Design a protein with these regions (language model features):
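Substrate-binding rim/cap in mid-to-C-terminal beta-strand-loop elements of soluble/periplasmic
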Residues: 343-385, 451-493, 507
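Beta-strand elements within well-structured catalytic alpha/beta cores of enzymes
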Residues: 30-42, 61, 87, 129, ...
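Secreted, luminal/periplasmic, and some membrane-associated catalytic domains
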Residues: 53, 79, 100-116, 122, ...
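A long, amphipathic alpha-helix that forms part
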Residues: 45, 234-259, 272-313, 489
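Active-site nucleophile/metal-coordination loop of metallo-enzymes that catalyze phosphate/sulfate
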Residues: 25-29, 43-134, 145-163
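Bacterial Sec-dependent N-terminal signal peptides
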Residues: 1-28
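His/Asp/Glu-rich, glycine-adjacent segments
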Residues: 100-261, 270-277, 400
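Loop/turn elements at helix/coil->beta-strand transitions in domains of secreted/extracellular proteins
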Residues: 29-34, 64-68, 95, 134-139, ...
Length: 507
């Protein structure tokens, strides 16, 4: 005879055991993820200034973390906005739509910036965390810069904070929840900027250069009292301290990491040249920036460790994969170089197309390294876009300094491994019909907008580092790409990766 009571009791005990196991597994998920992007971080500088670091910042990350020293972005070109967007979405501009900090609106033919989460075409890791927890997770992003804050916050975040270029106040977007009280109460730079002075953090940092030129150097002193004072301040070594203080205030005020529901804090630091000057004009400033950043990372990690415990937190650190363009005088040293005038070339191209098909404004405009064809005109003349771009490509390839020319048709239809990075950086709705690549050492100048871009194909080495929960100290020399960061975090906190992410987790 079957003992139904015994079976029922067995089923109950088995289910209870499964629930306990599931609960234990869930408890292992990090309570907090801290995603740190360091704008223009370079591994060679990171190593060069190592004698100046303490034990709790960069050294703690490199010695105790899971380090991937050979990281890269799987698309080109890269800037701060596109890099941060790629980290948070786990994909490239061809899917997330962030082709750069600025692009041309095809309707108005005017530049637009990514100052709204609506610019993102896909979900971020923060968005997916909000969905997975029914909105219970706390998600914030903090950066000196608007684009980085918004691109890392995503659509569903509680908020994003950055320093306003005009007022110096920590501000946010109306897209998110109403201003948090703790952010409103946080002091702005408005009343104190004139009293701030940036000098070397120590005599050693201020008097001895660890750059290749090396040796003794004069210390620097900078005040912030011009019309551009807040913009300049955001590129100095002091700004990272403000970011760290606000990040700690955010975690404290919102009780991040204090319960079993995972929270996410995205932070952007700055490690580029002061006021975007050439490196030879700000070597000591850059050295000081790295040393101060080392102290700020140590302060952040210590605060997290004391309040939550690093074993319950996943910290991710990476760079943005580019640096400010350096106006190197190649001509002086007889290195091949030159200037490609985009606006002049566009006019010549328009004349060439006019000779083929009759007079008309075939070229609507040009922007960055892109040329935009007048679609309405070629349609009225019954000329296909494929034909117009092909003819344009053939003409432009004959110009001095042009290394390659890509057409929108080519990037959308061909699956050529050699074009992979260019294809991944192309988003049809926000890019031109023709993309020009000039030879290394050449620069593109648009005299109409007074903008210039330089061509340098060399690789900027930077790391991806994980510290804390689910990681052990180890160095992985295998080259990896940054689109694998988001799925790695998603796996660690047991949620879906962002909806356009097709890359595998790093571990």
């Amino acid at each position: 005879m079957i003992d139904h009571k015994h079976i029922s009791l067995s089923v109950i005990l088995t289910m209870a055991a499964f629930e306990m196991a599931a609960g234990q597994e869930l408890a292992q998920a990090p309570r907090l993820v801290v995603s740190i992007s360091i704008d223009q971080l370079r591994s060679d500088y990171l190593e060069a200034f190592a004698p100046l670091y303490g034990e709790g910042g960069f050294k703690r990350l490199l010695n105790n973390g899971l380090v991937y020293p050979n990281a890269s972005y799987p698309f080109t070109p890269v800037d701060r906005a596109s890099a941060v967007a790629s980290v948070s979405t786990g994909t490239t501009p061809s899917y997330n739509g962030i082709v750069g900090g600025r692009w041309l609106n095809k309707e108005t033919l005017r530049p637009v910036t990514c100052d709204s989460p609506g610019s993102l075409s896909v979900s971020t890791i923060g968005d997916e965390l909000k969905v997975a927890t029914g909105g219970k997770s706390v998600v914030y992003a903090i950066s000196p810069f608007c684009d980085a804050a918004i691109m890392s916050a995503g659509h569903a975040a509680n908020g994003a904070a950055w320093i306003d270029d005009r007022t110096g106040k920590w501000t946010s977007s109306s897209f998110y929840s109403p201003y948090a009280g703790w952010l409103n109460a946080y002091s702005s730079l408005t009343g104190v900027i004139s009293a701030k002075e940036w000098t070397p953090i120590s005599d050693l940092v201020g008097n001895f250069s660890y750059f290749l030129s090396g040796g003794l150097s004069k210390p620097f002193k900078h005040k912030f009292n011009t019309e551009r004072k807040f913009i300049q301040y955001k590129t100095c070594g002091l700004v990272n301290s403000d970011v760290t203080s606000l990040a700690i205030q955010c975690m404290t005020s919102t009780s991040m990491g204090q319960d079993a529901v995972t929270d996410l804090l995205s932070i952007t630091y700055y490690a580029g040249n002061y006021d975007h000057k050439p490196l030879n004009e700000c070597q000591m400033e850059l050295q000081d920036t790295y040393v101060r950043l080392d102290e700020d990372i140590a302060r952040l990690l210590n605060d997290i460790d004391q309040r939550i415990g690093l074993s319950k937190v996943m910290v991710m650190v990476t760079g943005t994969g580019y640096t400010d363009e350096d106006n190197a005088d190649y001509e002086k040293f007889k290195i091949p170089s030159g200037t490609f005038y985009l606006n002049r070339t566009a006019n010549l191209l328009n004349m060439y197309l006019g000779a083929l098909w009759g007079q008309g404004q075939y070229i609507e405009t040009c922007f960055g390294r892109e040329v935009f064809i007048n679609h309405k005109l070629i349609e009225s003349k019954q000329i296909s876009l494929a034909e117009a771009t092909k003819r344009s490509q053939e003409f432009l390839l004959q110009m001095s300094g042009v290394r390659n020319v890509y057409t929108s048709q080519q990037l959308l239809s061909e699956h050529n491994p050699q074009l992979a990075k260019v294809h991944n950086g192309f988003f049809a709705e926000r890019c031109g019909d023709i993309i020009i690549e000039v030879a290394p050492g050449w620069k593109i100048i648009n005299e109409n907008t007074q903008e210039s871009t330089h061509s340098r194909a060399s690789y900027i080495q930077f790391p991806i580092i994980f510290l804390g929960a689910a990681t052990k100290a180890h160095k992985v020399e295998t080259p990896v790409t940054t689109d694998r960061i988001a799925p790695t975090i998603a796996k660690a906190i047991r949620i879906r990766a962002p909806n356009a992410c097709m890359s595998e987790p790093l571990f």
